[in-house]
Each structure stands twice: as structure tokens, then as C-alpha cells.
């Protein structure tokens, strides 16, 4: 009986890459796998045909011979009649599908495994984040069971080798002309069985516990930064190493300061008279109060920089600055006399160039409305 073209069997072109070839074989093999088509008597033949095609085309030398001479160039090496045999199909299937079915170089037997990492969110004030601190935290976790030493077996006893898999954690299942490795259903891949479990951990080898830990927070941390505590995660299974604990920083809002990188920002209200005549006032910083000089004729929104009064980055470098934005406060609750004095001041300023921005704005409005055609 004549054989179909191998490229046609896998539905690929003759210039297909090795990666695309493997992908095509996976698709065809999954489609015609006997376990998925128990009601189709032809599926096994189609599966064998696809495996034979892939066995040839995935080998550079065999593929070159096939491209030059066709089936005649590989008949001595491919298929069930040559050196490949059923064992080769098993190897091919395990290589391509090992991560799905546990065959070939895929999963291995169970054994000690690393514990899971944990995450803890630490709320910090801005002061503690900038200056650094040490805090105590309580973390629920899994720790190794002390009575059994993490084995899960009753003290004085030991886990027994699984009789189903012989301690390998895997069993080989014969599927027609090939075999597939699967996780042992008896020991679930552990390779051993606990016949007399520990009463403390009920055979799990680990117990729940809330640990109290001391966390040293370095100066300069910010929201999103993580502090790693090695080995403070969950205990590993079967004596495996513990995972790590990652403490994630969340800096709370401050009543006065806002942080942007290494700089701090704040708003400072000043009186109308200090803005006009100039003055000096105290402003708070994270290191205490400092004096800020306000020059005469200061406009609202102006930024004043206090160098070095910001944040020192956690990874080193120069400290940032404190940026003070002044906000001019309009007087309220004026007395009759105060209002009269302000009226006199207002009258005395008519015709003077005391409000250049306002005058520029009014001039712009005149030009704007003058250009409008009503």
C-alpha cells in the first residue's frame, strides 16, 4: 500500500521550520490520539502515520534523504518495519508531549520541595518611610511539624516505600505500541506512603502557625518597594527549604507633605501683606522647623526650594528637596475701619502699574471680543 507524503500527513510545507513542525505534529497527534478516539478504529493508524512522519522529518539527515528520494530513501529507517520500532514512537511522543502526559523527560518523582513565598503589606507613615524604622509583624504561615520533624509520620516511625511504584513516584502505562509515564496514583508521586500519620500534623509534615518577625525598614523606602526576608516563607514539604517572605511597603498619605520621588512638596499659606511687603515665617520639615524668607511682591503659587530637606533615596545618593508652594490668603472678617483702609489703598493705586498680569488679561479680553464679529 502506498504511503502518503509526510509533509501532507502533518499539514505543513516542505520549508517548514523545526519549531513549526513540532507544533504541527502536536496538533495532529492530539487529534488522533487513541485515548481520545476510542470509538474510531482508524485513529490509531492515523496516529502511527503522524508519528512516523514526524520521526523522519524531525531528523535532519532523514529529512534530507526523504526530500531527495522520497519514501525509498528512508524505508530502511522509518516506521514499524525498520530500526525505529515502537520504542522510538514512545520516545518521540514523550519528547513532544512529556509536559502533558508525564512521559519522557517531563515530570519526575516527588521529593523535598521548596515552600511557597509569602507576601505581607506593611503600612508605614511618611516619617518612618523616610527615616527608616524597625517594626514587628505577625504572619500566618506553615512551619515544619516539630514532633515528626516534617516527615508526616508518627514519631518513632518512618514513611514506607510505595509498593505500587517502588519508590519512583511514577508508573509506566502501556498504551498499545508505546508506553507513557504517569504519576503514581497510590503515593501521588511521593514515592513513599505514611501508614501511621503524626497526630500533630495529620501526616502533612507541616502545621499552621503565626510567627512574629522583626522587619528592619531602611531609610528612603517608598510605596511598592519590597523587603525580602529569606527563609521566612512557608516551610518546604518533605524537608525542603522554606520560601521567602516579601514585605511590600505602602506609605500612607501625610497631612502636610506629598512625596514625588526624592522631593517633598507642601503648601504654605501666607498673608496678603507678607506677599506684598515680604516677610519671614517658619515651615515644618521632617527634621524640624526652618525659616522661609518671603520676598516682597510674591505671587500665589510660587515655589520655594529648601535644598536637602527632602528624601535620601533608599539606594543611596543625595537627598532631595522640600518644595514649598505659597498660597496667598485673602483676609476675611474685616472690620469697617479695615475695609475703609483697603478702599483708600485701592483708590490710591488707580492708574498705577501695580497689577501687570490683570492688566494684560483685560487687554487680551478686549482684543478677543474686538475680533469677534457680532
UniProtKB/Swiss-Prot annotation:
CDD domains, alphabetized: DnaJ, DnaJ_C, DnaJ_zf
Swiss-Prot/TrEMBL CXXCXGXG motif repeat ranges: 145-152, 162-169, 184-191, 198-205
InterPro entries: DnaJ, DnaJ_C, DnaJ_domain, DnaJ_domain_CS, HSP40/DnaJ_pept-bd, HSP_DnaJ_Cys-rich_dom, HSP_DnaJ_Cys-rich_dom_sf, J_dom_sf
Domain (J): residue spans on this chain: 5-70
GO MF annotations in UniProt: ATP binding; heat shock protein binding; unfolded protein binding; zinc ion binding
Co-factor(s): Zn(2+)
Subcellular location: Cytoplasm
Zinc finger (CR-type): 132-210
Cofactor note: Binds 2 Zn(2+) ions per monomer.
Biological process terms in GO annotation: chaperone cofactor-dependent protein refolding; DNA replication; protein refolding; response to heat
Keywords: Chaperone, Cytoplasm, DNA replication, Metal-binding, Repeat, Stress response, Zinc, Zinc-finger
Signal peptide bounds: none
SUPFAM superfamilies referenced in this protein's UniProt entry, alphabetically: Chaperone J-domain, DnaJ/Hsp40 cysteine-rich domain, HSP40/DnaJ peptide-binding domain
Annotated residues for binding of Zn(2+) 2: 162, 165, 184, 187
PROSITE patterns linked: DNAJ_1 (PS00636), DNAJ_2 (PS50076), ZF_CR (PS51188)
SMART domains in alphabetical order: DnaJ
Entry GO CC: cytoplasm
Keyword Repressor in record: no
Assembly and oligomerization: Homodimer.
Family of this protein: Belongs to the DnaJ family.
Comment text on domains: The J domain is necessary and sufficient to stimulate DnaK ATPase activity. Zinc center 1 plays an important role in the autonomous, DnaK-independent chaperone activity of DnaJ. Zinc center 2 is essential for interaction with DnaK and for DnaJ activity.
Main function: Participates actively in the response to hyperosmotic and heat shock by preventing the aggregation of stress-denatured proteins and by disaggregating proteins, also in an autonomous, DnaK-independent fashion. Unfolded proteins bind initially to DnaJ; upon interaction with the DnaJ-bound protein, DnaK hydrolyzes its bound ATP, resulting in the formation of a stable complex. GrpE releases ADP from DnaK; ATP binding to DnaK triggers the release of the substrate protein, thus completing the reaction cycle.
Protein known as: Chaperone protein DnaJ
Gene responsible for this protein: dnaJ
